[in-house]
Amino acid sequence: MQVVYRRCGGLDVHKDTITATVLVFGEEGQRDVRKKEFGTHWKELQRLGQWLRSSKVERVAMESTGVYWKPVWNVLERTLPMILANPYQVKNIPSQKTDRRDSEWIADLLAHDLIRPSFVPPPEIRRMRELTRYRVQLTGERNRVHNRIHKVLEDANLKLDTVLSDLLGVSGRAMLYAIVKGQCDPGWLADYARGSLRAKREQLELVLRGDIQDHHRYLLGELLADLEFVESKILRLDQELLRRMEPYQDSVERLCTIPGVDVLTAWTLIAELGADVSAFPDAAHAASWAGLCPSNCESAGKRLSCRTKKGNRWLRRALCQSAWAVTHKKDCYLTALFYRRAAQHGTKKAIIATAHQLLIIAYHLLRDRTVYRELGGNFYDQLHPQRTQNRLIRRLERLGLQITIRPQLAHAEPPLTKRPRGRPCKCSERGIACKHRRL
């Protein structure tokens, strides 16, 4: 096999040790293998970089082993051309496995250009990626606290969630804090209702009559304190993300023009894909990297599976949430796409297809520096009007109806509305054409 890089390095990274191999190929094909072990603290990483530079390597490859690869990458990427490999794609031939053999195997694959580089964004994007992922974890913790509060209330036979649409809204929290302070009279607790909830006072008094014990009050107090703590952390994190996203505010605004995409989803897209999507040749490569396209499993001319491949679960999660939000939009191309796919393949596959389309749109907006252009909910009907007409006729004929097609007559303009004399209209103030007439 042809040697592409004559001087290359391979690293087998662990928590406390790094096994490095430098592979040098001579003009006549001879191999010179040099191996050395290093630690993982700062001075050892500096010594590793100096040893690799003194060996004059052209490329250095390493596996993405948990979080252990990140400190090594952060130090070496400043002075050496690095390649991050997916461990699943660089598995060694089954044999006696050792760290020294693994590092040599990685170097050998790199020398023959058999390693597909993983996408590693610039340092600033990586920092924002850690913040957006941490926010997802905090949101999950907040939801877990919500569930624990529901459990305590059910144990105390307080069915508040059957009346309140948001148990932890303004009214719900006021009632919970009053319960923690010792209030248990349903009439007094119902007085904390705000807004339209006041009209449900009788129902509130009914569901607030339960069996509240001292340990319930203690648990509610602790859980409400936990909830306030987590929400304060989310608020501070949002402020930090807002500060770091200022250089990319133009990209955030472009992404927010897509139906179903809010600011948090736009932050996630930029943190996972990067504001510069040139690392992906086209939108199909980006969708494959995110795990939002069918896998390619074929044998003997038959497709064995079409399940989506593994990809970036953080990006996939954000896009699927946006896809669910799109389903509630009206007169929207993405909504029409979802219901079209849902009728053919089911809801879950339709959500993946909609998320795939969202990623394609986001890719083009970031690459072309443009905004979203709505195609309308009738896009597919107008794409093939004759096909749509024939399909609807067949459906009506199956119901026993006889259909006659006639061209639609032009709509006549609506008559002018009559207004009492002496009371002028406000069309001119609103800047619209006046169609009123005075009697």
Predicted regions and their residues:
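A detector of single, family-specific signature residues
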Residues: 1-439
